Amino acid sequence: MEFIDLKAQYRALQGEIDANIQRILAGAHFIGGEEVAEFEEKLAAYVGRKHCVSCGNGTDALQLVYMAYGIGAGDAVFCPDMTFIASVEPACMLGAAPVFCDIELDTYNLDPVSLEAHIQSVLAEGTLRPRAVVAVDFLGNPAKYDEIGAICKKYGLLLIEDAAQGTGASYKGKKCGS
């Protein structure tokens, strides 16, 4: 059973899609180029930011963030237990340990109460350094950034928004991914 008729959506836009694909293939600028620059400009404007740096996929984007902040071996990265593997795979590739926290059943997003309990548990155990929290805008539902942000501030943790599923959604008037 098809949930969404992708073929009908393609047929409705087929001329425009095919023409743009042919134009891009003919230009042979697959990495960088004017299409990427245009995309980054438009996405930055859409989410209300000056800049946007696009990546090949969300996994690469998260890995760049982890690397930029020096997250690696011995570090704990807290994330919801209901997410796509890409939310934590890059942290694991760099040697960090994911700590899975419960979700709220009404939003499927990171439960701030569970997050704080897991942070306290990791601190009490003493084998990992709490470093970051990955909040996922699961199925387009923004996480509770005010509460999660306050917890991150309290413990000195980096808050990373995994907005791969949240493009177009807003939290308190701010676009996800901004």
Name each model-derived stretch:
Residues 28-76, 90, 100-102, 174:
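Phosphate-binding glycine-rich loop
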Residues 75, 81-82, 102-104, 163, ...:
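Nucleotide-sugar donor-binding loop of glycosyltransferases
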Residues 83-88:
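Conserved coil-to-alpha-helix start sites within the AMP-binding
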Residues 1-29, 34:
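N-terminal "arm"/small-domain region of PLP-dependent enzymes with the aminotransferase-like
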Residues 1, 75-76, 157-158:
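Hydrophobic "anchor" residues on beta-strands that sit immediately upstream
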Residues 106-178:
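Active-site phosphate-binding strand-loop segment of PLP-dependent enzymes
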Residues 6, 102, 138:
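Conserved donor-binding loops in enzymes that form glycosidic bonds
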Residues 95:
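Structured binding elements
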